[in-house]
Design a protein with these regions (language model features):
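Small-residue-rich hydrophobic transmembrane alpha-helices
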Residues: 9-75, 106-125
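Short runs within selected transmembrane alpha-helices of multi-pass transporters and secretion channels
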Residues: 26-30, 99-118, 124-136, 140, ...
């Protein structure tokens, strides 16, 4: 960021404020989703937890999509009110457009991860996120900025390059049902029946 123009830095400052509002709301949604799923896993009602998980992931994606569309609809007066004009306004608008697409997938990944953790699978999502960050995102962003001197908005978009790939992997893991790993007595009492039904080895 320190190597970007003043206009880009101004746009980032405004964008981070708006992003923070979105994250504040949907992190609460994600926490609620993890409680709703984790409670059922702990009680041994794994089928309910399984069905509830994918419904909550899609509900979150739908809500964040609606929120981003609303943000885009009012972006012009909003960005002007926050002091962006000219080039900084153009960059800020571009960032909102990119984020509106990326956020739907990103928040879906967030809910996936929190749901897996609440069901006893604390490692899968976290390992995936860290691996993609260091093996894909950082090399891409570094190369785009320092080697190819790409436009700022392209560099910004590359920050989300891992999200669609992780989403597909997260979806496959969710439907595999392998993330349901109870530790409570009630959960352990019914887990074998659930695994047999879903073909989990």
């Amino acid at each position: 960021l320190g190597h970007q123009s003043e206009q880009a830095i101004a746009a980032v400052a405004v964008f981070r404020t708006l992003e923070g509002l979105v994250i504040a709301f949907f992190s609460g949604f994600s926490n609620a989703a993890s409680v709703l799923v984790g409670k059922e896993v702990g009680a041994g009602r794994h089928e309910i937890a399984y069905e509830r998980a994918w419904r909550l992931v899609y509900l979150c994606s739908g809500l964040i999509g609606a929120a981003c569309l609303t943000l885009l609809a009012i972006h012009e007066p909003l960005l002007h009110a926050m002091g962006l004009h000219g080039e900084s306004y153009r960059i800020g608008t571009g960032m909102l457009l990119i984020y509106s697409v990326a956020a739907v997938i990103r928040m879906g990944n967030w809910v996936h991860n929190d749901t897996y953790r609440s069901a006893g699978d604390a490692a899968f999502g976290s390992i995936l996120e860290i691996a993609f960050m260091y093996l894909l995102v950082l090399p891409l962003v570094y190369s785009a900025n320092y080697v190819f001197h790409a436009p700022f908005l392209l560099i910004f978009a590359l920050c989300y390059a891992d999200e669609p790939i992780r989403y597909l992997i997260m979806q496959r893991h969710m439907y595999s049902a392998r993330w349901i790993r109870p530790v409570s007595a009630a959960g352990l009492a019914t887990i074998e029946e659930f695994r047999e039904k879903h073909g989990v080895n």
